[in-house]
Design a protein with these regions (language model features):
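N-terminal presequence-like segments and the immediate start of the first folded domain
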Residues: 1-71, 77-130
Length: 130
């Protein structure tokens, strides 16, 4: 995996501008902050992020993948304000579960998610090396 950083661009904080990779592609559907029984256990934004990331890790593990194989994430949040207010705690949760691996990322505020109590949904793409 190669991180793509154009010359003279400032280094991004917490994500990469691009990733080049070869291997088996894994596409992970949007994961929300519910557990394996489809129950949201917390209304706290950071805790929903924690569970969504745990769900991504579980799907990856089903294909012998690891967090460092993630090349792209798209975060859908229902409140930009709540996302930004939780930024430090989200970063702590992210580093705890994913480590200091920062794939290409996008965050988008949406009007709502399909599950009423969900505050965040995260899609991921991973490449497991050949």
């Amino acid at each position: 995996m190669q991180i793509l950083q154009p010359p003279n661009w400032p280094r991004p904080n917490g994500f990469s501008n691009g990733i080049a990779a070869r291997g088996r592609l894994i596409f992970i559907a949007g994961q929300i902050g519910w557990d394996e029984h489809c129950r949201i256990q917390s209304s706290d934004f950071s805790e929903q992020v924690r569970q969504a990331l745990k769900n991504i890790i579980a799907v990856l593990a089903a294909s012998d993948g690891k967090p460092e194989h993630i090349v792209r994430m798209t975060w859908y949040v229902t409140s930009k304000r709540e996302y930004l207010a939780s930024y430090k705690s989200i970063g702590k949760v992210y580093r705890e579960l994913i480590g200091r691996h920062y794939p290409a990322m996008t965050a988008v505020e949406v009007a709502a998610l399909v599950e009423d109590d969900a505050k965040v949904e995260i899609e991921a793409t991973a490449v497991i090396p050949d």
